[in-house]
């Protein structure tokens, strides 16, 4: 009783009692002491560190894109390469903006939507680039058609024992990647709509939350796309060997799928209580948003190393050496703006999707034809296999392939 009385009517001569009492009552529940670890995401240090890696990655990649557009000597190949390279600026800058505004549950979802849509675009372009390297569908089929599919548990072909490669196999690979280009944007739009109605929260696996169903659909779609890429690489790895496909394949796969599995790991950690929420008088952020903030910070750092690796994997120097044609003449070069415009034109993707998903699919492809009379210099052939395939695309005619079994 005396203690409570002293607290209500403090003695002016004892200031310690007066100062101690308000300090206890003024400390809100969920004070900064409860968020010592995650508060790093809100500091200037986190923004500066992530910003340094992001802007450095942007400079490296934008210079590489500029050089590809300047040496735009193989449009059919470089169109897909430039599209793939754009994943670094989009991923890096988008993640950095999400990190800057991660305390708002709305903003980071919208930023992530743009990033998610583009990653599906990259998978398709990587497969299309491999097609271009090998001269198109008909050139690939002339090499692998009728060959038995080797059974391998590593590449997931153990269930295909006894089957042979057919045009249906290539169609399946294209369809499996194209479906991801459709499913991913649809899931991104669904996420925005569910978020607006309060039915979506990162890391919430409750049956009433849209996060559970979006994650399941996305998992199925991305697994199918990845499986198709593995199958195609398994079938053509020897043909692709002159183009260093392992590094290219690893980089594209890691940039896209590593970020996904990082997000899944953070969601599991959040569910286990390893990621606390931020709850203070100034701001209140749920565990799912904090996990998304960590994901954005990690991506910002990773994009710097991705930019360095992609610079080596998709070097422009190969195309700078191809400015001279077989006759030693300077190949006509387009302006950088027109090359960029051609690169960003999605007409080829739309046409490919219509062709591969059309019920009237006739199993036709573009057959490349080589000009006769190869040039010999000093007793050695002057054109490599890659030059021959590239030059072959200059003269194309439509060839109707005979129908065979679907894959």
UniProtKB/Swiss-Prot annotation:
Role: May activate the MAP kinase signaling pathway.
UniProt modified residues of type Phosphoserine: 388, 402-403
Region (Disordered): 1-31, 369-395
Annotated keywords: Membrane, Phosphoprotein, Transmembrane, Transmembrane helix
UniProt cross-references to InterPro entries, sorted A to Z: Ostalpha/TMEM184C (IPR005178)
Protein name: Transmembrane protein 184B
Family: Belongs to the TMEM184 family.
Organism: Mus musculus
Superkingdom to which the source organism belongs: Eukaryota
Compartments (UniProt record): Membrane
Gene Ontology CC terms: membrane
Keyword Oxidoreductase: no
Organism taxonomic ancestry: Eukaryota, Metazoa, Chordata, Craniata, Vertebrata
Bias (Low complexity): 1-28
Membrane topology: Multi-pass membrane protein
Annotated TM spans: 40-60, 84-104, 121-141, 178-198, 214-234, 249-269, 290-310
Major subcellular site: membrane
């Amino acid at each position: 009783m005396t203690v409570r009385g002293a607290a209500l009517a403090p003695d002016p001569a004892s200031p310690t009692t007066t100062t101690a009492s308000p300090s206890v009552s003024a400390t809100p529940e969920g004070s900064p002491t409860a968020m010592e670890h995650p508060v790093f995401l809100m500091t200037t240090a986190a923004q500066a560190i992530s910003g340094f890696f992001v802007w450095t990655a942007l400079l490296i990649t934008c210079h590489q894109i500029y050089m590809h557009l300047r040496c735009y000597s193989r449009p059919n190949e470089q169109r897909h390469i430039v599209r793939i390279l754009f994943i670094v600026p989009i991923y890096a800058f988008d993640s950095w903006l999400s990190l800057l505004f991660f305390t708002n549950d709305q903003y980071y979802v919208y930023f992530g939507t743009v990033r998610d849509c583009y990653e599906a675009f990259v998978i398709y372009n990587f497969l299309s680039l491999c097609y271009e390297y090998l001269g198109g569908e008909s050139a690939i089929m002339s090499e692998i058609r009728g060959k038995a599919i080797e059974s391998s548990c590593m590449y997931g072909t153990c269930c295909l024992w006894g089957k042979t490669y057919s045009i249906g196999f290539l169609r399946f690979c294209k369809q499996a990647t194209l479906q991801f280009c459709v499913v991913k944007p649809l899931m991104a739009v669904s996420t925005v709509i569910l978020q607006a109605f309060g039915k979506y929260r990162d890391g919430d696996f409750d049956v009433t939350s849209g996060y559970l169903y979006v994650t399941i659909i996305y998992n199925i779609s991305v697994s199918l796309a990845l499986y198709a890429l593995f199958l195609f690489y398994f079938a053509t790895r020897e043909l692709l060997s002159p183009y260093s496909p392992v590094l290219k394949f690893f980089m594209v796969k890691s940039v896209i799928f590593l970020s996904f599995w990082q997000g899944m790991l953070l969601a599991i950690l959040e569910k286990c209580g390893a990621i606390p929420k931020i709850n203070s008088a100034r701001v209140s952020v749920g565990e799912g948003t904090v996990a998304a903030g960590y994901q954005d910070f990690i991506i910002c750092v990773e994009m710097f190393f991705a930019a360095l690796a992609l610079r080596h994997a998709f070097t422009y120097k190969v195309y700078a050496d191809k400015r001279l044609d077989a006759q030693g003449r300077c190949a006509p070069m387009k302006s950088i703006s027109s090359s960029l415009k051609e690169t960003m034109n999605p007409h080829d993707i739309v046409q490919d999707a219509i062709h591969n998903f059309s019920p009237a699919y006739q199993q036709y492809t573009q057959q490349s034809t080589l000009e006769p009379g190869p040039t010999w210099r000093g007793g050695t052939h002057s054109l490599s296999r890659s030059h021959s395939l590239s030059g072959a695309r200059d003269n194309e005619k439509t060839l109707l392939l005979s129908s065979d079994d679907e894959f």
